[in-house]
Amino acid sequence: RDSVPMAVQAITSEELEAKNISDFNDIANLVPSITVDDSGSGNSYFYIRGVSDGGFGNRAGAQASTALYIDEQPLSTIGGNPDLHVYDIERVEILTGPQGTLYGSSSQAGTVKIITKKPNPEEIDLGFDLEYGDVHDGSPDRSLETFVNIPLGFIDDAMDSAALRVSFYDLHTGGYLDNVATTQTFQYLGTHSNSDYIELRDDYNFSDKKGHRVRFSNEFDNGLNLDISFLRQEYLSNGSWESDVAEGARKVSRYTPETFEDNFDQVSFTLSGPLTESIDFTLTSSMFERDIAYTYDYTQYVAYTGYDLYAAYYYDYDYYASTDPRVFYTQFDKYDRTSNEFRIQSVTDSGYQWILGMFRETNEQGYQTFYDFTGDLTNSSWVSVDDRWWGQDNIRDDEQRAIFGEVTVPVNEKTDLTVGFRKYETENDFFAQDGYFGNYETTDTGYFEWIGRTNLYQLGDDGVAPKFNIAHRPNDNLLVYGTYSEGFRPSGINRTTGRTAELVPDTYNSDLLKNFEFGWKSTLADGKVTFNGLIYHMNWEDYQSTRYVYNLLTVAYVDNVGMSTVSGGE
């Protein structure tokens, strides 16, 4: 990586194991340019070089500014990345700065690639790790990790270059937050204690995670390589990762149980090999499916009244006076992401190198949100559907198509020029439905039922992201380079209502990050010392900001809010 004229950091399998790296937070601790906004497993997102609007992980928000890959598949999701357990990994690559030409949208500020270990047809290999840890003022952690590598040549001579690698992990993370007794006074219901409704317990926020990965590879006699991989991970947590300072250190006070379930499957297929003597090809297809279900206690919000009916979820609930103060928030998310890429690249020994490819991706995100109550209404003339007092049901379809390429041309024996581009087109469909507890129509039986609002939005966009790089090697121990590159996030659609249509934009434009970078890589003291660095200045134009304004919309929306600059060094 010290010979590549770009900012890249690689964490090897040996370093991952030596430092007991197990999740993305551990990776971020090794990379100064990465910042993690951690709201618990599956609800965290990260950014590189500070390129963030300070968004709060809302599912209706803008796409991520930094891409997460596992092998050849992008996994970044709006509102929170999957919390992949790091085990049996070959290396982790961190590419800082815009990677828009080769990696596309959401690689606006950089890309993190987790590369799994490939099966080895040469030898049988297996191993396992057992861990047990004690959490101060909490419950213990424990984990089991194991892998096995099996060459398949014993099946048939034609399988001499084939192998299967299987890994498995099962982890329990102990809690350290206590759910303690508290009281809350409600305007219509008086004072209630949470101990009347929920079992109070110490170490409230524990979690379990387990998963397995199966990977098969085979190199055929004609030089073709086939690689097939399947990954599944299941995660379940109890409790909250928030704390209430009014109750004391590491304490919360909840009225309803809270859980978070996050399961995903990933399947990938890669075929690669020589197309001609001087050209190789790679064809990859991958699918990613993720299902999330979680509940969140919302009871204490009910204590506040008097806001606009259309902006305050709790108003209807308190106005019509339930006999039970408990309110909870439930959400169901479903992600289906399919990616296909075909690329060819030169494999000559000359300084002239190139890569050319095509990419297509479909990404469907469905999310349902409900604010539910548990008690009976004191005014029996008002009824709700499934005890819900506000709900939304949304399906967001994004499609992206692109062609991309880079070419490196030697200017002279010591200087190379690289030019790249990505021509992309995006299409967005957004089906949205929501409604309040007080939004009713009369049925034949004389009861009322929720009707809500339904909208369908559509949007298309296109653009070109360029890259220019010049690299100069004055001697064998020094490389200096300069880069201009662009990264982007695609345009999108907001859900608006009639009364705020003139205040909230129906759509938002793609934003653009323009990066100017100068760097160097050097070795000193006969190769014993490595000294690398860079400085950068980035202009973030029309940057997308996720906003929530209670008196405008019941959900978050995205707006282009101007230009920002980011400068720094690494």
What are these regions (language model features)?
Residues 58-59, 65-66, 71-98, 146:
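Short acidic/polar hinge/loop motifs at secondary-structure boundaries
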